[in-house]
Amino acid sequence: MNVKHGTFKGGIHPPYRKESTAEVPLGFGKKPEMVIIPMSLHIGAPCTPIVKKGDTVFLGQRVGEPNGFVSVPVHASVSGKVIAVEERPHASGDRVMSVVIESDGLDTIDPSIKPYGTLEDMDADAIKKMVLNAGIVGLGGATFPTHVKLAIPPDKKVDCVVLNGAECEPYLTADHHLMTSQAEKVVMGLKLAMKSVGVEKGFIGVEDNKTDAIEALVKAIGNDSRLEVYSLHTKYPQGAEKQLIAAITGREVPSGALPADAGVVVMNVGTAAQIAESMITGLPLYKRYLTCTGDAIKNPQTIEIRIGVPFQSVIDQCGGFSSEPGKVISGGPMMGVTQFVTDIPVMKGTSGILCLTKESAKIATPSNCIHCGKCVGVCPIHLQPLNIAEYSQRNMWDKCESNNAMDCIECGSCSYICPAKRTLVSSIRVAKREIIAQRRKGN
């Protein structure tokens, strides 16, 4: 099979700093003594707890029931006893209702869990139902419920599924390790997704700095002519949904539209692998790969870890802090979220825990815009970040909206390239919040 090539216009080349974990063997987290399972592990309506303090639970048992279509159940990632159902700190910065489970160390699987069979055994509806029951969401970070993504509206026509294996965010190597160690499951998950939405074409996009992953996927695909691997130019944000679609299909997703409007379903390679895993074992999404890294970590590593394990436990399993951290980020340096405590749990969308020293975490003092236009040149959406940010700082929300602020994907390329060190993406993010607030008010 020939590997094809592609990229998009714009983007940046930050230091990728992936070597410290890409070249280290995958680690496997120890059995946790306690897990915290938030009722909000996905975009959409939070779940309602269906267990109470003192209950005994099995691994894989539902502990939270979804509310509404855009929601998925949450499951116990250990067997043991529920010791609390209460609000706990969450990666969003809020306190969220959570089920706290003390592990019995046995990992006794819920007896109702059975393998689903094979690809041939399952029809489209059965795949969607399995994906919902397994609590599968986008594992690239967005955590959008996957069964919703697979439920194509009648007025939309899709003709392909694209898997995102770009992993363009600096430091992170979770998807890289997944593609090299579970290539067969990634490909099987792609086939299941294709069958679910009724298409005969599938693509996997991987940045060209991951040649071993590309080789593993090509081998797993074999002679299936319906599937293709794209070697994508190493550039940030190559893994952004619209940029990935443009690089592989040449199609442009219109402003305000979704991938389905361009005839495409996009999902992360980790999501695809989990779909296959759930079919084979019957188990829900209860663990994931994540990268614990940064210059404040003693032994950076990508590790397989249970959902609900506190960040501090993951950090300790990677040797602990090498020095006092100046910043701890859930995710990567470009789009991750800074955390103020390390007792928050690993979420379904936690792709990384990035710990930076105080020196590395220093923020430069911004100065006045010099109108160099660099932010315009690198914007993958072809916006004018300098103008939108200026309007935002003047509270000119209508101007922000007319300059397409809502199309911003908040990738941070503009802030990174700005020689004046202006916090452009932060200003645009404020504008987007205000625009949404005004729309809700009907203004």
From Swiss-Prot:
Question: Which HAMAP family would you find in this protein's record?
Answer: RsxC_RnfC
Its function?
Part of a membrane-bound complex that couples electron transfer with translocation of ions across the membrane. Couples electron transfer from reduced ferredoxin to NAD(+) with electrogenic movement of Na(+) out of the cell. Involved in caffeate respiration.
Whom does it interact with, and what assembly results?
A: The complex is composed of six subunits: RnfA, RnfB, RnfC, RnfD, RnfE and RnfG.
Q: What is its main location?
A: membrane
Q: Which PANTHER family does the record associate with it?
A: ION-TRANSLOCATING OXIDOREDUCTASE COMPLEX SUBUNIT C
One of the GO biological process terms: electron transport chain
Name the coenzymes or cofactors required.
[4Fe-4S] cluster
| Residues the record lists as binding [4Fe-4S] cluster 1 | C369, C372, C375, C418
Q: Which residues form the 4Fe-4S ferredoxin-type domain?
A: 359-391, 398-428
What is this enzyme's EC? 7.2.1.2
The family classification in the record reads: Belongs to the 4Fe4S bacterial-type ferredoxin family. RnfC subfamily.
Q: A Pfam family name for this chain?
A: Complex1_51K
* Designated name of the protein: Na(+)-translocating ferredoxin:NAD(+) oxidoreductase complex subunit C
Q: Report if keyword Transit peptide is assigned.
A: no
Query: Where [4Fe-4S] cluster 2 is bound, by residue?
Result: C379, C408, C411, C414
Gene designation: rnfC
Q: Keywords assigned by UniProt?
A: 4Fe-4S, Cell membrane, Electron transport, Iron, Iron-sulfur, Membrane, Metal-binding, NAD, Repeat, Translocase, Transport
Compartments where found: Cell membrane
Top-level taxon of origin: Bacteria
Q: Which GO terms describe its cellular component?
A: plasma membrane
For this protein, the record's SUPFAM superfamilies field holds: alpha-helical ferredoxin, Nqo1 FMN-binding domain-like
Q: How does it sit in the membrane?
A: Peripheral membrane protein
Q: Quickly give the catalysed reaction.
A: 2 reduced [2Fe-2S]-[ferredoxin] + Na(+)(in) + NAD(+) + H(+) = 2 oxidized [2Fe-2S]-[ferredoxin] + Na(+)(out) + NADH
Q: Which InterPro entries does the record cross-reference, listed alphabetically? A: 4Fe4S_Fe-S-bd, 4Fe4S_Fe_S_CS, Ion_transpt_RnfC/RsxC, Nuo51_FMN-bd, Nuo51_FMN-bd_sf, RnfC_N, Soluble_ligand-bd
Cofactor: record remark: Binds 2 [4Fe-4S] clusters per subunit.
| GO terms, molecular function | 4 iron, 4 sulfur cluster binding; electron transfer activity; metal ion binding
Q: Which NCBIfam families match?
A: PRK05035.1, rnfC
